[in-house]
From Swiss-Prot:
Organism: Homo sapiens
Subunit field text: Component of the Golgi-associated retrograde protein (GARP) complex, also called VFT (VPS fifty-three) complex, composed of VPS51, VPS52, VPS53 and VPS54. Component of the endosome-associated retrograde protein (EARP) complex, composed of VPS51, VPS52, VPS53 and VPS50/Syndetin. EIPR1 interacts with both EARP and GARP complexes and mediates the recruitment of the GARP complex to the trans-Golgi network. Interacts with VPS50 in an EIPR1-independent manner.
Entry-annotated residues carrying Phosphoserine: 377, 580
Superkingdom: Eukaryota
Residue(s) carrying N6-acetyllysine: 110, 360
Major location category of this protein: Golgi
Gene encoding the protein: VPS53
Entry's localization field: Golgi apparatus, trans-Golgi network membrane; Endosome membrane; Recycling endosome
Region (Disordered): 373-412, 794-822
Gene Ontology CC entries for this record: cytosol; EARP complex; endosome membrane; GARP complex; Golgi apparatus; intracellular membrane-bounded organelle; membrane; perinuclear region of cytoplasm
Cited PANTHER family: VACUOLAR PROTEIN SORTING-ASSOCIATED PROTEIN 53 HOMOLOG, VACUOLAR SORTING PROTEIN 53
Full protein name: Vacuolar protein sorting-associated protein 53 homolog
Membrane-related topology note: Peripheral membrane protein
Kinase listed as a keyword: no
Amino acid sequence: MMEEEELEFVEELEAVLQLTPEVQLAIEQVFPSQDPLDRADFNAVEYINTLFPTEQSLANIDEVVNKIRLKIRRLDDNIRTVVRGQTNVGQDGRQALEEAQKAIQQLFGKIKDIKDKAEKSEQMVKEITRDIKQLDHAKRHLTTSITTLNHLHMLAGGVDSLEAMTRRRQYGEVANLLQGVMNVLEHFHKYMGIPQIRQLSERVKAAQTELGQQILADFEEAFPSQGTKRPGGPSNVLRDACLVANILDPRIKQEIIKKFIKQHLSEYLVLFQENQDVAWLDKIDRRYAWIKRQLVDYEEKYGRMFPREWCMAERIAVEFCHVTRAELAKIMRTRAKEIEVKLLLFAIQRTTNFEGFLAKRFSGCTLTDGTLKKLESPPPSTNPFLEDEPTPEMEELATEKGDLDQPKKPKAPDNPFHGIVSKCFEPHLYVYIESQDKNLGELIDRFVADFKAQGPPKPNTDEGGAVLPSCADLFVYYKKCMVQCSQLSTGEPMIALTTIFQKYLREYAWKILSGNLPKTTTSSGGLTISSLLKEKEGSEVAKFTLEELCLICNILSTAEYCLATTQQLEEKLKEKVDVSLIERINLTGEMDTFSTVISSSIQLLVQDLDAACDPALTAMSKMQWQNVEHVGDQSPYVTSVILHIKQNVPIIRDNLASTRKYFTQFCVKFANSFIPKFITHLFKCKPISMVGAEQLLLDTHSLKMVLLDLPSISSQVVRKAPASYTKIVVKGMTRAEMILKVVMAPHEPLVVFVDNYIKLLTDCNTETFQKILDMKGLKRSEQSSMLELLRQRLPAPPSGAESSGSLSLTAPTPEQESSRIRKLEKLIKKRL
């Protein structure tokens, strides 16, 4: 009974003392201990075993028990000491809290005393300084009153003096005095309710009005609207009057400027009236020479009369430009039928030169409030005439490099006067566009005539792949037209010129490039094997001569150059045309045309080499392969194919050296054309003996090696063939080899033969299978059962086919057949 109670007590104690892992970890960190009794996972059995590891150690059990009891007594003493120490902790805490509260109350009392003393000090300071503030206010008001009285005295005296000086036209003194009076009057805006102040303000306004009318009358007298200018330079009175006008209402200044410029240009309107001979475009230089003389005359006579900030010389020039633009537009509308392209370009050139002269002479500061910005807003940094005009030699060099731009120099700032006069020519630029249409048509006709007269370019391996000279000439002319037209306008005329460019790019592609590609001819059939194989260097089997092959390559290189340059041309046109018209610039159709020429050229080269190899393939299919008795060197038809490849490919490669990617395209297209054709002729070789199949397999491997080496054949520099091309050749020729391996395999047992076919040819089908059976010379009755077996086994997955196909060509076949294939493979390796 006692034992049960003790067990229950221990369980309750363990349940009460069960701590969470976090608490246990915290205790271990605060009170680190190496004693096993302090561990949370204490195990009494393990602890006893450590104390008494052997039976012999039990002899010391009494000593160990005494030590443990002594340790327990020490722990009990420590616990009692700690418990007694905690008896008065609560009382001590309450006492400390009461002391803290008393200290806080004392602190609040001291703070309140300090606050009361501060308020008393503030009140004392206010009482002390009350009289001083009143004195400060009095001083400030007195100062303001004195200042206002002084201003009033100055204003009254100034108004009297201003009225007197105005009557005596003493503008020099008036200019200084008026500005002072205006400044003083600003101080009295808040006193306008006082009658005397309002009266003085009205007198100032009246004096300003009188000054304005008086100055305008003086200028009208000095520079009358009707009649000629009075001799002699300007008077000092007018110079001082301009200083006064600067202070008066801005309308007075504008009226003076308007009257002076109108009087200054009155002679121009008379000299260059519409009915005068000098008014026409052919004498446009005289207009600009006249204004240049007038500007010089102005600087000499009137340069010091007007303030510098008025920019009178620039204003005269700008007004001259506006008048000239209107007069030229009117006279060109009247005499539109007399405008010729040379005359128009002459006038535009002289006008743009004059606008450039204005840009160098003046800053354009007077144009901010004018109409120029509305007239012309060219895209930034695209005016070609702000750059140095390149020489024709530089243009040709740049064009040959495929770039329409010269090495760019730092661009000059925009011309603020661009278009201020030349804008009037834009409605008549159709004359220029029509002229360029005619000139380009004649240029294309000349290219055609020159090609017929001079013939195709002479073959030259050192300059292989050079573009036709006419191409460079065309784009040089295009650049000249584009630069010239962008000088004239960046609006609709540029769109019209782009349409002309498109027209003659297509004509060049059709008449010069496509029109001069050699035509292919078909060869006659019915030739014997011996005649088909009589092919030596210089034979007529190849359809194109050396000159024709070079011509095709030149046309291809030219088309590639045109394609790249047309793309650059489109970009430059978009740079130069107005932003709102960029979307209407699109030369994609013309680039597609040149791409078509490139494709046609490559196709011609492929067809030519393909056709040259046709007789050899025909000879292959006509040979009696069942009569071949032994495997020898490569067959004559293989030698013939290799001969044609070595004749054509180096020529094409050398002439397409500058367009390597299109030579690669040629190789790929030839492989895609030749290999299927070779396999087609391979199926025609029937029936075939075992030895004949071995010979064909050897020939096929030889052709495969030649095709893999095709891109660098007969080249001193051996380059690795492109991976895409190698993949096509390996895939196609490996299929041909697999077909021959199937042909070489015995057709019995049937299951093994069919499984071999499925294994070796991944694209296996009944049609190919029947062709292979025909090559083996099997009868139709034998073929039917084999075809039926193939149909049954085709749906099987590739893995099953491979597992069943473990009966490979060598393993399940008779010993004699496997030895033949091994011999053939050794022969191929020996040749390599």
